[in-house]
Amino acid sequence: MFVWIDRRAFLLLHGESLVLHGGAQGLRDEGLLDSALSRPVNLAAYGSPDVFDCAAAHAFGLAKNHPFIDGNKRAGFLGAGMFLRLNGHRLTATQKDATLTMLALAASEVTEADYAAWLRTHTAPA
């Protein structure tokens, strides 16, 4: 059983990220956000994913769906990190490594499964 990301809390986190790091505020498509946040829930309902598979599904869905005007890759990374934290894990990767890996996921240079494997090796218990 997983603790899922609350949509409103995620919107606040994304907004805070834009304030801190720059970018245009706004949601481009609510349906795409809902789809991205539902992706890991559906994965868990119809499969046997671990916490890292679900975190990767958050990252992939948010980065690929582009629900926001700006900061979609950042949103994907934040979604993965938030989900991991809610479920007892914390990221341990360097900022550079995390950025390069997230960019590779968004560019389809690594798969969602590859990203889940990367998360497994770059986390620790919270």
Placement of each model-derived feature along the sequence:
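FIC/Doc superfamily catalytic core
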Residues: 1-126
